[in-house]
Swiss-Prot record:
Belongs to the HAK/KUP transporter (TC 2.A.72.3) family. InterPro entries: K+_transporter (IPR003855), K_trans_C (IPR053952), K_trans_N (IPR053951). The chain crosses the membrane at residues 60-80, 97-117, 186-206, 226-246, 249-269, 300-320, 323-343, 370-390, 418-438, 455-475, 482-502, 508-528. This is Potassium transporter 9. It comes from Arabidopsis thaliana.
Length: 807
């Protein structure tokens, strides 16, 4: 090694010898392992918005009923009972409650969500994780720093740029300034995600139980246990059919929900005309004031029941990916909203006259002639609404897995037409057990309603917080507009939240327990994922070490292609050095494969792979980054291996055509390192007679020797007069030779080399970290799907390399 020179002895403006060497090696490493930003194809205007005819818009609005509004549409089944669980004392209380329902529907679903929040979508994708992805593109808030500037060139990587000095730029700088702010943002996002998972348990339970409750209304002597049993049977059937997908029966959803809305709207209009038209005075907000003045604390607590009238709003936002925003706005404004208002007004008109029927207001207000048809349609609508929530939960879990926030689970694509229709067996059975447990344990709608309301209002609060950042960073709204939106949203939602707090001991604790367990799982998994990535980054092998091994890497190069999987998008991973140290042989062609997820909903197939060469051509080492969005799936018939090798062949052709001569952009490592190569072979050969500890000693000495020869590794330009290159081969011949070699290696066999990593807490770590890593994460890693299973790697071509990471 060169002697170290103190900075004080070097003239100003000059670098030390050591600094010059380090700088030269850094420059060389950058040239040999270049950023991957040149060869990806760009699809221009792939997602250009297309104009829709009015007929097509109406058709899509109709279809959106079955997917988007099933959950929101079934709320009339249970709202009034949960608002007055102890009975109705004064008919004016019904008018006050109706007024609250009307303005809740107006402010939250209609104004806030349909016309404001739904515009904050990620290329059509909604939900808390979609908002988080949008924020990750506009600010550096992602905790796993595996992105590269080439990712920003993706067709789907849309973002806006803030003007320097603007309020948006200041907000961005503030958010990126501290690590704890990024973590706090992620915790908020995960909290909303956990509550949405809780919705996947509570929505089917309360919807199906409320719908089947109609049996008892027509037969008052029937035991309540029979109603619960019927609901459980329907729930078991619903979850058992999930693996078939909704592709074959999905066409029924929209007609069922359409008939449901027409039924409740017509019934509501009938009841208004028959019982009491004066309920229409509830459109005056004065009755809200009189309601709270008259009922006091009890009126405030009843907001927990009123809240159920807007449940399903978050599901509406999460499901907007299937339809144009304008179609959703038309369907809600001109059909769903009026039908819901008529339904609630009709029930209120009935309750003003028949206060004793507060427990079954919906079914009791139905005319006898249409009772059983309404019961059948109500049950169908409850199933459709539950199906939409269950499917939404699958999508949320899929997104969480892609963000590194949830253990790997099996995901099955159930439709050939629609990318978003998936099925998660593991999550499905957990949801089913949760639904059955909630339905059988509580039995009463009011207790499940309290739990449901708690989950819904917390998701809304999380959405409001994220919308503030969207309005500042993405939309660049004036801070006064942001302040008005924040104040109005928090005023309404915190009012509801303060009411559900009083009902935590009456069922409201259920979503909190579900959220706590889910948040623990997701937080620990993400924390361990970040620590694994940091460990790999710090332990990656330098290019100088690779160059020191020579063209054959100091190993026996056996025929075939080795795909070495790693989390790193740059640098040589630790798994490679660990592998060749213990097994001194490697394939003739080595490809480091990094499968990474980006904060975009999808990556087009044409832009999926990025390929670069590592080191000189004689090394035959490449890097391939396979990029996916959070909605993309690893399907078994994707033919990942062939697509990767096809992209590699294309890269070789393009690279050869772009080079004027075969040696124009390559770098030689043969000068003065032949001895290093021979010594390395001898060292590894001697390792066969020693134990593992001796292997590591030999490996260390080999690295030390390589480092001592760093000053002998220089670019090809400086060696032009020393090393002779053959200029006889044409570009076509060189390309043909390398492609033929690649084809021969492929025929010899492709081996997938993956790390079987055990993560342990470093000695001296504090107790919570040891529990999280050594017990919670270890358990989750043991029961989750292996990477090889997720990527559909054939078992016969898989080679696992054991590693232990101390984080």
């Amino acid at each position: 090694m060169a002697e170290r020179v103190e900075a004080s002895s070097v003239p100003e403006g000059e670098n030390t010898i050591e600094e010059r060497e380090v700088g030269a090696m850094w420059e060389l490493e950058q040239k040999l392992d270049q950023p991957m930003d040149e060869e990806a194809n760009k699809l221009n205007n792939m997602y250009r918005e297309k104009g829709l005819s009015m007929l097509m818009l109406l058709r899509l609005s109709f279809q959106s009923l079955g997917i988007v509004y099933g959950d929101l549409g079934t709320s009339p089944l249970y709202v009034f009972y949960n608002t007055f669980p102890d009975g109705i004392d004064d008919s004016e209380d019904v008018i006050g409650a109706l007024s609250l329902i009307i303005y809740s529907l107006l402010l939250i679903p209609l104004i806030k969500y349909v016309f404001i929040v739904c515009k904050a979508n990620d290329n059509g994708q909604g939900g808390t994780l979609a908002i988080y992805s949008l924020l990750c593109r506009h600010a550096k808030v992602k905790l796993i720093p595996n992105q590269h500037r080439s990712d920003e060139d993706l067709t789907t990587y849309s973002r806006t740029v803030s003007a320097e000095g603007s309020f948006a730029a200041k907000t961005k700088k503030w958010l990126e300034g501290k690590e704890w702010r990024k973590r706090a943002l992620l915790v908020v996002v995960l909290l909303g995600t956990c509550m949405m998972i809780g919705d996947g348990i509570l929505t089917p339970a309360i919807s199906v139980l409320s719908a089947t409750g109609g049996i008892k209304v027509n037969n008052p002597k029937m035991s309540g246990d029979i109603v619960v049993l019927v609901a459980i049977v329907i729930l078991i059937g619903l979850f058992s059919m999930q693996h078939y997908g909704t592709d074959k029966v999905g066409w029924l959803f929209a007609p069922i929900v359409l008939i449901w809305f027409l039924f409740i709207g017509a019934t509501g209009m009938y009841n208004i005309c028959k019982y009491d038209t004066s309920v229409l005075k509830a459109f005056s907000p004065t009755y809200i004031y009189l309601y709270f003045k008259r009922r006091g604390r009890d009126g405030w607590i009843s907001l927990g029941g009123i809240l159920l009238s807007i449940t399903g709003t978050e599901a509406l936002y999460a499901d907007i990916a299937y339809f144009p925003l304008l179609a959703i706005q038309l369907a809600f404004t001109f059909f769903v909203f009026p039908c819901l208002l008529l339904a609630y007004c009709g029930q209120a008109a009935y309750l003003v006259i028949h206060k004793e029927h507060y427990q079954d207001a919906f079914y009791a207000s139905i005319p006898d002639s249409v009772y059983w048809p309404m019961f059948i349609v109500a049950t169908g609508a409850a199933i459709v609404g539950s199906q939409a929530t269950i499917s939404g939960t699958y999508s949320i879990v899929k997104q969480a897995v892609a963000h590194g926030c949830f253990p790997r689970v099996k995901i099955v694509h159930t439709s050939k037409k629609f990318l978003g229709q998936i099925y998660c067996p593991d999550i499905n059975w957990i949801l089913m057990l949760g639904c059955i447990a909630v339905t059988a344990s509580f039995k009463k709608q009011s207790q499940i309603g309290n739990a449901y309301g708690t989950a819904v209002v917390l998701v809304m609060l999380v959405t409001t917080l994220l919308m503030v950042l969207i309005m500042l960073l993405v939309w660049h709204c004036h801070w006064i507009l942001v302040l008005i939106f924040t104040f109005l949203s928090f005023f309404v939602e915190l009012s509801y939240f303060s009411a559900v707090i009083f009902k935590i001991d009456e069922g409201g604790w259920v979503p909190l327990i579900i959220a706590a367990i889910s948040l623990l799982v997701m937080s620990v998994w993400h924390y361990a994922t970040v620590k694994k990535y940091e460990f790999e980054m710090h332990s990656k092998v330098s290019m100088s070490w690779i160059l020191g091994l020579g063209p054959s890497l100091g190993l026996v190069r056996v025929p075939g292609i080795g795909l070495v999987y790693t989390e790193l998008a740059s640098g040589v991973p630790h798994i490679f050095s660990h592998f060749i140290t213990n097994l001194p042989a490697i394939h003739s062609v080595v490809v480091f494969v990094c499968v990474k997820y980006l904060p975009v909903y999808t990556v087009p197939e044409e832009e999926r792979f990025l390929v670069k060469r590592i080191g000189p051509k004689t090394f035959r080492m490449f890097r391939c980054v396979a990029r996916y969005g959070y909605k993309d799936l690893h399907k078994k018939d994707d033919d990942f291996e062939n697509k990767l090798l096809t992209k590699l062949s294309s890269f070789i052709r393009i690279e050869t055509m772009m080079e004027p001569t075969s040696n124009s952009s390559t770098y030689s490592s043969t000068y003065s390192v032949n001895h290093t190569q021979d010594s390395t072979v001898d060292l590894i050969h001697n390792n066969n007679n020693h134990n593992h500890n001796n292997n590591m000693d030999m490996f260390s000495s080999m690295v030390d020797y390589t480092v001592s020869t760093l000053d002998t590794i220089v670019s090809a330009e400086s060696l032009h007069n020393t090393v002779s290159f053959s200029q006889d081969n044409t570009v076509e011949e060189e390309e043909t030779d390398e492609l033929e070699f690649l084809k021969t290696c492929k025929e010899s066999g492709v081996v997938h080399i993956m790390g079987n990593t055990v993560v342990k807490a470093r000695t001296g770590s504090w107790l919570p970290k040891k529990i999280a890593i050594d017990y919670v994460y270890a358990f989750l890693a043991k029961i989750c799907r292996a990477n090889s299973v997720i990527l559909h790697v054939p078992h016969e071509t898989l080679l696992n390399v054991g590693q232990v990471f101390y984080v």
